[in-house]
């Protein structure tokens, strides 16, 4: 199946559909998380009271970023072209669902997705776990092999690989993970151009 034949596309949000603005090092410092630890995994391992307080801080920090979000180069045009082709579109993000909705509205992409096709960290295990992609495949009644996962980081590609989907790397200057990326495009505009 070529990229032009794919009808089921799942996108990461931050850094893929939007310009990446999260300062993960600053978030780790504010939450007293070791720099080598994954933020979400670290919070999940904390005692309930401490985790709740830190999750609340993270949610408020992300809310500020959501309202100020800006679209990634060519992302809106890519999504609208895919919708015109009759493609089913989903979002799989490590962000909170409610903030994903805010972000997508802020960047003019809210009309491209059904709310139930937007999975955040509370609806699916955080990437690189494949659970979110597998959930969308089941919901859409398709095999994961017929899906593309588009993202800007190795977690997106690892998620695709683990689910049996194909991974597309975008919005980075070069392909840092050629062993994981089935396709690479420097940005969403270039990916749009590959559709023909």
Regions of interest found by a model, annotated:
Residues 1-50, 56:
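Active-site neighborhood of HAD-like aspartate-dependent phosphohydrolases
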């Amino acid at each position: 199946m070529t990229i032009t034949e794919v009808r089921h596309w799942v996108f990461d949000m931050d850094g893929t559909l939007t310009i990446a603005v999260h300062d993960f090092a600053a978030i780790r410092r504010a939450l007293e998380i070791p720099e080598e630890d994954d933020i979400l995994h670290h919070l999940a391992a904390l005692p309930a009271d401490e985790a709740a307080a830190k999750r609340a801080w993270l949610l408020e920090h992300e809310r500020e970023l959501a309202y100020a979000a800006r679209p990634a180069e060519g992302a809106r045009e890519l999504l609208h072209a895919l919708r015109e082709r009759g493609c089913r579109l989903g979002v799989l993000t490590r962000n909170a669902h409610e903030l994903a909705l805010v972000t997508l509205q802020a960047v003019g992409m809210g009309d491209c997705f059904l709310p139930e096709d937007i999975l955040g960290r509370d609806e699916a295990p955080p990437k690189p776990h494949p659970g979110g992609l597998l959930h969308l495949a089941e919901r859409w009644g398709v095999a994961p092999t017929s899906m593309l996962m588009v993202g800007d980081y190795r977690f997106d590609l690892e998620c695709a690989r683990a689910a049996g989907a194909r991974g597309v790397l975008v919005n980075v200057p070069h392909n840092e993970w050629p062993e994981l990326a089935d396709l690479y495009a420097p940005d969403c505009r270039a990916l749009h151009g590959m559709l023909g």
